[in-house]
UniProtKB/Swiss-Prot annotation:
Binding site for Mn(2+) 2: K258, D263, D281, E342
Annotated cofactor note: Binds 2 manganese ions per subunit.
MF terms (GO), sorted A to Z: manganese ion binding; metalloaminopeptidase activity
Keyword Metal-binding: yes
Family: Belongs to the peptidase M17 family.
Enzyme Commission designation: 3.4.11.1, 3.4.11.10
Protein name per UniProt: Probable cytosol aminopeptidase
Gene source species: Helicobacter acinonychis (strain Sheeba)
Compartments in which it is found: Cytoplasm
């Protein structure tokens, strides 16, 4: 992990083996920009990057005056520098446009520091010829790129320290999530997922309970158990319950995650091409583990419960079948018409368990539907629920954190599509259209009336795992949901 060191000095006086200078919105008129004739000779116009080898300066373009692009450019810069022979880099403080003018400096520092740190991530656990970067340190010269109000300048050091704590915690939490999602299925079993959660709990002084199939049977979590039936003798299920209890808690929040450690579709078998990347079907549960790490280390004033349903969905003589009727923990019967709509079955019972805790807010995270990816693209998560104020708060705070989110609306016509003639509800829609919403409406069937306005469903199927670099995310897992929900909880508590 890249170490960030704060220095109360001018950019020119800070000592490092190389310099990083951002060109914001193609503006070269700044003292930190050297040898402009060289840049003109090579026709560098402030897009992408350019290495001035003589002066040991890496120029990286920030295409617009936007804090999210600053974060992305900082990440891109480190991806370039970590391939070179520099051990340290220095960079000044930039103030790009933010949504919130009150916290503009802090948000810029958070973006800069997080971008720098995330640029170092690469999942290379199984590579035999790892090339470890020599880049170890980023020196932050506490000098502003351009003048700002006196109050802004006076709060620079304080804001930098706060931003650095955020970046350290968020990087660690995202890496926990990403490493778990990226872990291949021969290792990343339900038991392994529980072990990762136990390690996080031990290091963060969190309370944790890990329950096996006997507990699930006692609690009549039959929908969850059905999904695991084909794997029971080899990789049994685990219900993981992490708890963070601060001395002062303004709210009780339950975070619920789908933890499908591998999903072949069950007897409704996926085509081979669609089976690849299904190690990432534990993205929701992994995000919840990362979130408990983030929220506890940031010291939020909320009691937070993280509930993860960890299981495989495989084939075998004991596998649950299309035509089965399952009785959920809530007592509702479910007609199974497709065993590849399994995540919602696990979540149904886990959401029931979460409601027993009587929380003020429930948020579930799941790589739930391919339909969500079709509708919103692979970079955007969907927000669903009944409470418009809660949905809006998650969307605005999540967007400000740098994640992409969009609301999808429930409606009575789509709800009719999951009706069953022989059970209380069907696990798949009668139509191919609106699949992300009908999946959310299925979960809604297991939310009690008193919790309808306290519940949000976040479908992270798109951004949880993408097989290319994008924004601050490397190939593979992105940690979708962690930044967004952390920001959501912080904003929620401000209103408490």
């Amino acid at each position: 992990m890249l170490k960030i060191k704060l220095e109360k000095s001018a950019f020119e006086n800070a000592k490092a083996e190389c310099s990083l200078v951002f060109i914001v919105n193609k503006d070269f008129n700044h003292a930190w920009v050297k040898n402009k004739k060289l840049l003109e000779t090579f026709r560098y116009e402030g897009e992408d990057s350019f290495l001035d080898q003589e002066n040991k300066i890496l120029y990286v373009g920030v295409k617009e005056d936007n804090v999210h692009l600053l974060r992305e450019s900082a990440c891109s810069a480190i991806r370039t520098l970590k391939k070179l022979a520099f051990k340290s880099v220095k960079v000044g403080v930039y103030t790009c446009h933010t949504h919130s003018k009150d916290n503009a400096l802090l948000e810029n520092l958070k973006a800069l520091f997080l971008g720098l740190k995330l640029g170092m991530y690469e999942y290379d656990t199984f590579k035999s010829n790892k090339k470890e970067s020599v880049l170890k340190e980023a020196i932050i010269a506490l000098e502003l790129h351009k003048p700002c109000e006196e109050t802004c300048a006076n709060s620079l050091e304080k804001s930098a320290k706060e931003a650095l704590k955020y970046a350290d915690v968020m990087t660690e939490s995202l890496n926990i999530t990403k490493n778990l999602v990226n872990t291949p299925p021969m290792i990343g079993t339900p038991i392994y997922m529980a072990e990762v959660a136990q390690k996080v709990a031990k290091e963060g002084n969190l309370e944790i309970h890990v329950y096996d199939e006997k507990f699930l049977e006692e609690k009549k979590m039959n929908a969850f158990l059905a999904v695991n039936k084909a794997s029971l003798g080899v990789n049994p299920p685990r219900l993981i319950h992490l708890i963070y209890k601060p001395k002062k808690a303004k709210k009780k929040i339950a975070l619920v995650g789908k933890g499908l450690t591998y999903d072949c579709g069950g007897l409704s078998l996926k085509p081979a091409d669609y089976m690849v990347t299904m190690k990432a079907d534990k993205g929701g549960g992994s995000a919840v583990i990362g979130l408990l790490n983030a929220l506890s280390n940031l010291g939020v004033e909320a009691e937070v419960h993280g509930i993860i349903g960890a299981t495989e969905n495989m084939i075998g003589p004991a596998a649950y079948k299309p035509d089965d009727i399952l009785i959920s923990k809530e007592g509702k019967s479910i007609e199974v018409r497709n065993t590849d709509a399994e995540g919602r079955l696990v979540l149904a019972d886990c959401l029931s368990y979460a409601q027993d805790l009587n929380p003020d807010v429930i948020v579930d995270f799941a790589t739930l539907t391919g339909a969500c990816v079709v509708g919103l693209g692979e970079f955007t998560s969907a927000i669903m629920g009944h409470n418009e104020e809660l949905k809006n708060l998650f969307e605005t705070s999540g967007l400000e954190s740098g994640e992409l989110l969009a609301k999808l609306p429930f409606n009575r016509h789509l709800k009719k599509l999951i009706e069953s003639k022989i059970a209380d509800v069907c696990n798949v829609s009668a139509s191919r259209y609106g699949g992300a919403i009908t999946a959310g409406l299925f979960l809604n069937e297991f939310i009690r009336d008193e919790f309808k306005d306290k519940w949000l469903h976040i479908d992270i199927a798109g951004p949880a795992y993408v097989e290319k670099e994008w924004d601050v995310n490397s190939f593979g897992a992105s940690g979708a949901g962690v930044r967004a929900c952390t920001a959501f909880v912080e904003e929620l508590l401000k209103k408490a």
